[in-house]
Amino acid sequence: MGIASVVVVGGGVIGCAVAYYVAKRGLKVTLIDQPKRGRATSASAGGLWPLGESVGLGCGVIYYKAVAGMGTLPDGVQGPGQLPRTFLDFAIRSNAMFPQLSEELCEISGIDIELERTSLLFLMYDAGDEAFAKPLWERCPCGKDLTEWLSPEELAKAEPAVTRAVRGALRFNGDDQLNPYRLADAFRAAARNLGATILTHTEVTGIRVESGQVKGVETAAASIPCDLVINAAGAWASEIGRMAGIEIPVRPVRGQILGTETLPKILTACLSTTDCYVAQKGHGEIIIGSTTEEVGFDVGVKPAAMKTLSAGAIRAMPFLQNVHLKRVWSGLRPGSPDELPILGPVAGLDGYLNACGHFRTGILNS
């Protein structure tokens, strides 16, 4: 096997995106797709929510509600609204790239990522929700340019299927959605069409380092010499890091998700509440998520989570009590101590880059 200038480890959306951008630069790249169950792409509804997530009112609000009952947040976890302004700027810029990226990927790969300009609505059921959201909204760096405070009447007009038992909603107009599976497939196919080598069902067994320089990647099938390895292994990034002699603080965080039967279009925006998020995809399925669980690499689905998420979705959209669930599944998000991605080189190790720890924002930041 010839020399691969760049080897990307990880076949989720981040790994496929990295391989695409490297191939687009004309470099020789090999993408190693390890056979791992439950990678983060499968735990995503495909939300592009730079504003909602940055201020703590995206799907992360479910987690914050849970830990609030404990009195304090776990060590190393920031509270709502405390993600750095630099991350918000980064996320907004990333989101703004998607319309052009969608066209580009469709042209190169032939795959439509089903980008929809939807907005995100945070529903406020009671005074507690309102008190929680208002200061975050008031401190939002983008101010009133990309956000709106909707009255119950305005919400009912915008989304007739949403419950009337609300005090209002906060709308983030710059937050959208796409199909996460099609995004990963499009990045992968586009990378291949630009010359990337894709190794599927290939287990990485080691990273060869000599005198502080990465020299190659070992797999069960072959040794692949390279000048640079990029660790995009998602929840398994720590394992890959240790093969290179470094420690990366990435851990698996399980998210369980529900999907309904196909329905006519009844929801335009994506919904976020303190119970769940709800998003209707282009093909009619409604996605309901998501738990945030520290259970290691367990990708099982639990009846208790299904019940809790279902109740939250019905509270947001009473119509759903008469709708059948079609599927349930889970995925492992790559959590980091501060919920921010871990990117770039590592001191003392040449030829190695991290592209991991994206937690809930891997789709957005791909």
What kind of region is each of these model predictions?
Residues 4-30:
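N-terminal Rossmann-like FAD-binding beta1-loop-alpha1 element of flavoenzymes
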Residues 12-13, 235, 360:
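Residue-level detector of alpha-helix initiation sites
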Residues 17-24, 34, 46-53, 60-80, ...:
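Active-site substrate-recognition segment that forms the wall
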Residues 33, 151-152, 200-202, 327:
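Short loop/edge segments at beta-strand edges and connector loops
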Residues 47-154, 312-314:
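Dinucleotide-binding Rossmann-like beta1-alpha1 core, especially the glycine-rich loop
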Residues 89-92, 122-132, 170-189, 300-305:
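Short beta-strand to alpha-helix junction loop
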Residues 169-228, 236:
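Helical element adjacent to the flavin cofactor pocket in flavoenzyme catalytic cores
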Residues 175, 349-366:
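Glycine-rich phosphate/pyrophosphate-binding beta-alpha loops
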